[in-house]
Amino acid sequence: RRYGLASGGDAPAAWRRRPPQPADLAFPAGSNPRLEAIGGEWATSLPPLARLEAARQLFTAQGLRYTLAPATLPDTAPLDALLFSTREGFCEHFASSFTALMRAAGVPARVVIGYQGGEWVPADGWGSGYLDVRQRDAHAWSEVWLEPNGWVRVDPTAWVAPQRIA
């Protein structure tokens, strides 16, 4: 299928400045105790930007591995298991664990799912060309709320598997 896309105005800029909602800080207490404890410590000892850097350091120090066939995570404390036990996953795993960690640290955060990449197909004389986006281009990342910038994109998969993001 082919879909058309049109863009205009300043709607995206305004949308990025919409303040966070309570859901952007929601973290089920006790659901992932190790992650919750780390985030809680950062919330009381680090300013928001330093919490992002601490998360980057945690992700890179854990020796996480990108794979499309990760081990099954347990029903209890799955994000703790991902970061401290199985240490393998794909973009949705890394984005959700980073987002939960930021929320536990008091930084509003959300997961964004979309596409990264695609292949430009030039015009063939009948049209104007198009971007061919396939399932393999699907990707998940996070956004965090940082004053005064608003929502800022953070892609924890880039810390784990930079070649996946290139």
Segments (PLM) and residue ranges:
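Charged, low-complexity, helix-prone segments enriched in Lys/Glu/Asp/Gln
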Residues: 39, 165-166
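Acidic low-complexity segments
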Residues: 1-85
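Hydrophobic/aromatic-rich core segments of domains that either
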Residues: 93-165
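Short, contiguous acidic/charged loop-to-helix segments that flank catalytic cores in large enzymes
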Residues: 81-90, 129-133
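Surface-exposed beta-strand edges and their flanking turn/coil or helix-capping segments
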Residues: 16-20, 124, 166
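Solvent-exposed loop/turn segments at secondary-structure junctions
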Residues: 10-13, 59-65, 73, 89-90, ...
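Conserved structured core elements
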Residues: 49, 85-88, 92, 96
